[in-house]
Amino acid sequence: MKSKLSDFIAGLGLCGILTTFLFCALPAPAHSQSQSTPKAAAISSQAQKSFSTPQDAAAALIQAVENYDVPALLEIFGPDGKDFISSADPVRDKSVGAAFAAKAHEKNLVTIDPKNPARAILLVGNNDWPLPVPIVKKRGKWYFESKEGRDEILFRRIGSNELDAIQICRGFVEAQQEYASEVHDESGINQYAQRIISTPGKHDGLYWQNQDGTPGGPISEGIARAIEEGYTFSKPSAYHGYYFKVLKGQGPSAPLGQLDYVIEGVMIGGFALVAVPAEYRVTGVKTFIVGYDGIVYQKDLGPDSINIAKNMERYNPDKTWHRTDDQWPAEVLANAD
């Protein structure tokens, strides 16, 4: 039986579409992709592309998103849009782009502001979701006002990623509890998993492959591999904007004080997880930690968040960490069921 972590993340297929329009706003092509190629770098320094009509601007955006055309998006949004079309999570970005394009093909409409004829808004989908970046008329041409939309887009994306990270932390606790309810690898003792993906031939992680090739463990292979990438910090792709790391000990501020979770090679003293944004103030702001009691704490570790998390070995929720009660809206989770 898979844990609710699997159910929750599997449901993000639908939630991803919902949050694209509720929180994330626009697709965010890979940060490395937008900066690493000479063509993209050259485009980002050029003047922003203009259009004869707001309808032409909207059509160009929809086509660029549908084709996942990073250079075209940089042209359309200009230098002020560079940040919000850049992310460390290209897999999710492409998925978000596909969802946006699908909604745009479902229905799209450009409306002129009745109080300002030089300002237009693109509405997409049957629910007429408004793009947070307005289209404005300057000197006889129409442009996307990227500077105005930038902060709102980043705010929505960060909020979405942080809520996902909190839910994954909570699901990790449930998965560990399910794992420890059985004895694995003929160890003769109930213990917690020290890994996300098991060593080949063993059941020492939250996911493993059975001898007949079928998946085993409290989480699915897809979820395990996605989180494992974040756990290792060795891949350019984060999972929903966050990296994750299993902690194998706790500090003096944790319940029962400082102790090691691993005793003679067996993790029986507890477990903990840290979730850190892949790009500070781009994919997330807060870092989250959770222990075996299931309480998620948050803290803004600043621009050096990722290095602090890399070096973090113990779960230590001192007074600088604060409990979070942030959750996905009930209606969003209900739609994921």
PLM features: residue spans?
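Flexible, glycine-rich surface segments
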Residues: 179-284
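Short beta-strand edge/turn micro-motifs at domain boundaries
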Residues: 120-123, 127-163, 167-170, 295-299
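Surface-exposed, charged secondary-structure patches
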Residues: 81-131, 233, 237-240, 245-253, ...
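Short, well-ordered alpha-helical segments enriched in acidic and aromatic residues
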Residues: 69-81, 190-193
